[in-house]
Amino acid sequence: MNQPLQHTTVLLDEAVHALLGDGDAPAGTFVDGTFGRGGHSRLILQRLGPQGRLVAFDKDTEAIQAAARITDARFSIRHQGFSHLGELPAASVSGVLLDLGVSSPQIDDPQRGFSFRFDGPLDMRMDTTRGQSVAEWLADAEAAQIAEVIRDYGEERFAGPIAKAIVARRTERGPISSTAELADIVAGAVKTREPGQNPATRTFQALRIFINAELEELQQALEGSLRVLRPGGRLVVISFHSLEDRIVKQFIAQHSKEVYDRRAPFAPPQPMRLKALERIKPSTDEVAANARARSAVMRVAERTEVPA
């Protein structure tokens, strides 16, 4: 039987250094947008000054339970997705950290339904207290809808055949309720396999992203960060696949240049609101020690003096 993996935080030191800067014991309010199991939050608290404050967000009830064990008065957590960080007071935050990866305890718990490696209920919700599970959505979705999700969020070229196979199995045997059943359907529909990759990888990724509205939440969080970051505040984002990184890259690029209004060619341009600082990949040593770091990309930007 596969044993659950202990979660190892990716780019831990690099992310916290980028967030807090070089100063000793910084003050100010910082945001950890994805508490997970607290890897980043605990290190931030170690390096934060006595007047500092850390606000964490997470949708996962198990993460909220883990956070309850932190008794530091400088720390608080909200049972919300990071898309809500824009509700914090404007220009009140010195740094925002978004780690977009799914934690190992989530992936490796069969009852959460995130992985094709373990047979369990086909759920995949980050917050199991609300919303549809993947099984519930697949029970009613049309083939065209399923194909669109798998193609757009998984970049899967066999999205059409996979969707047809899902609907055919559902029609023949009833709703698809387990991860093993879905993985078996996908394996039968994918005609060629990428070396070293399970044929269900892209489909599971796509359904997880869709059911949790991950890309929409990311866009909202990035927009919210512009509102809450004070001038000089840092935005640090760790992404794990090309769809996420593309959104982050484009967002930083969009706000790192002056914007002219074509309808008013003589009006002064809107000044840039972010300054791109770094793009960091895990070291070869980190990837060797933690295979899940392989696809990680960290981008760092700094809020300019211009108000939101």
Swiss-Prot record:
Cell membrane as a keyword of this entry, yes or no, is no
Could you tell me the Gene Ontology terms of the biological process aspect for this record? rRNA base methylation
What is one term from the GO cellular component aspect held by the record? Answer: cytoplasm
Reply yes or no: does the keyword Plastid apply. no
Q: Where does S-adenosyl-L-methionine bind?
A: 38-40, 58, 82, 99, 106
The record's catalysed reaction(s) read: cytidine(1402) in 16S rRNA + S-adenosyl-L-methionine = N(4)-methylcytidine(1402) in 16S rRNA + S-adenosyl-L-homocysteine + H(+)
Compartment(s) of residence: Cytoplasm
- Identify the keywords attached in UniProt to this record, alphabetized: Cytoplasm, Methyltransferase, rRNA processing, S-adenosyl-L-methionine, Transferase
* Name of a matching Pfam family: Methyltransf_5
Major location (coarse): cytoplasm
For this UniProt entry, the molecular function terms from Gene Ontology, in alphabetical order, are: rRNA (cytosine-N4-)-methyltransferase activity
Q: EC number(s)?
A: 2.1.1.199
Which major enzyme category is it?
transferase
Q: What does this protein do?
A: Specifically methylates the N4 position of cytidine in position 1402 (C1402) of 16S rRNA.
Looking up NCBIfam families in the UniProt record yields: 16S rRNA (cytosine(1402)-N(4))-methyltransferase RsmH
Report the family membership. Belongs to the methyltransferase superfamily. RsmH family.
Can you name this protein? Ribosomal RNA small subunit methyltransferase H
